[in-house]
Amino acid sequence: MSVTQYYGTGRRKTSTARVFLRPGSGKITVNQTDLDSYFGRETARMVVRQPLELLGSIGNFDVFVTVKGGGPSGQAGAIRHGITRALIQYDEANRSPLRKAGYVTRDAREVERKKVGLRKARKRPQFSKR
């Protein structure tokens, strides 16, 4: 017998998260690790929980996540995006409040590439008039 589950892929910066929602008690597992031990920063944990808190369904689902690439901030954003998509798959009526909160839109900002002749993407070497 197969358990009902909802899937969502989330991306942010260079991170990609595969999120599975199953009806449960509210346990969030990231890469076979508890959420609180995976993310050191409280802000990253808050970001992950945002869509569930918005809909008041924090205790209704168990969340299983595999996330690759990027750093803690990008991974947290990718997980949030994946949870949002899975919640929309669960119930299309969730789309409107999640859209209003800005969780449905993929944050398209990426790191700007370093240019030749510059120190970083935009930082120029010191200019000397004489």
Curated annotation (Swiss-Prot):
Keywords: Ribonucleoprotein, Ribosomal protein
GO molecular function: RNA binding; structural constituent of ribosome
GO annotation, cellular component aspect: cytosolic small ribosomal subunit
Record Pfam families: Ribosomal_S9 (PF00380)
GO biological process, one term: translation
Key word Nucleotidyltransferase present: no
Intrachain disulfide bonds: none
Family of this protein: Belongs to the universal ribosomal protein uS9 family.
Protein name, UniProt field: Small ribosomal subunit protein uS9
Species of the source: Hahella chejuensis (strain KCTC 2396)
